[in-house]
Amino acid sequence: MWNCRWLSALPALAAAILINGCANHGSHAVAKRQTGESVVLVGEAPANLAFAPLRSGPIAVRSTYRDGLPQTIHYQPGQDYLLDTSGQIRRTPGSRIPDFGTNMLYGKEDFRHDQFPGFGNRGFFVYVDYAHRYKWQHPLANPELGVARLPKTRQKLEAGEKVRIVAFGDSITAGGDASEPGLIFWERWTAALRVNYPRASIEITNGATGGDATVQGLQRLQEKVLQQKPDLVLIGFGMNDHNREGYGVPLDKFAENLRALIGRIRADTGAEIVLFSAFPPNPKWHFGSHNMEAYADATERVAREEHCAFADVYHYWMSLAARKKPEDLLANNINHPNDYGHWIYFQALQALGL
């Protein structure tokens, strides 16, 4: 479980976090709806939701992120689970909810995923809808890193013109473990842009490649980005760069590579750029350096210095996950977000204000 230790280093805007003991949650706050929050449950042990649910609000617990699918199982309170007012949920004896304790990676420390064929968490998630009263502000440290740095894109959208976007990065950006294409974070963001700017013609291309770090990104840039002649490029690296020595990219080289990507994109296309950070992988994974905060900070620093927009996925993720287990959000149990995790990325892009 992540904790609140990092809050002291954040500005006040980022410190309005959604957890007991760190939250701003007066009874006067407007009720909010949490949809499809994911959690895995071990035996009959309790697990935390991100927030404490309202007693009076409707609660739904099911087997799929999206409701109403042919395979969706709706779990019943008392029969399948117990949920208390503090936001703790647990399986009942004889529950139909899968027991995460039977996952092949459960309890493994410093595990190497290549030794466990078929690893993953997808069959173990339950998804919870509930209402809460927690007040929250987007953890965007500086609004100037948002839409203010995307004036050409905003102008084109408002004028109803064609806007070409390329999503560039690693397997997360490629859509890693989203259950359907429409739930990939940048697909969700594009759909929201189309609602906000109905006269504009918005095209988005998936230019991401699984397993890539910034080194491979530079090698693929011409084919995946420059040839598309984009107006806006979303750049998300760091997950593979941050891996331990011998598998990743050193921090200073990572920042240097981001600057090189930005320079080449601007020189060749004139496109505006959004950099976005990544979240911490499973801390029990052997290959992670578990220094993602430094890579997220480097991404933000490059965005500031190179006058790019910045989507702060790292702190958004940490704020929502502070009461939760890493496995609650990891579709592959390593470093791919599940559908709820893709929603967190989507929210970070929404915070740009475009």
Locations of regions flagged by a protein language model:
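C-terminal motif of bacterial Sec signal peptides marking the signal peptidase cleavage site
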Residues: 20-21
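Bacterial N-terminal signal peptides that target proteins for export
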Residues: 1-10
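Extended beta-strand solenoid/passenger and fiber regions
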Residues: 24-104, 110-139
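Short, solvent-exposed loop/turn segments at secondary-structure boundaries
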Residues: 176-181, 216, 245-249, 285-290
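Active-site segments of SGNH/GDSL-like serine hydrolases
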Residues: 236-242, 262-296
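Solvent-exposed loop/turn segments at secondary-structure junctions
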Residues: 171-175, 209-215, 239-244, 271, ...
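Serine-esterase "nucleophile elbow" of acetyl-processing enzymes
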Residues: 134-210, 219-229, 233
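Catalytic His-Asp segment of secreted/periplasmic serine-dependent ester chemistry enzymes
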Residues: 278-354
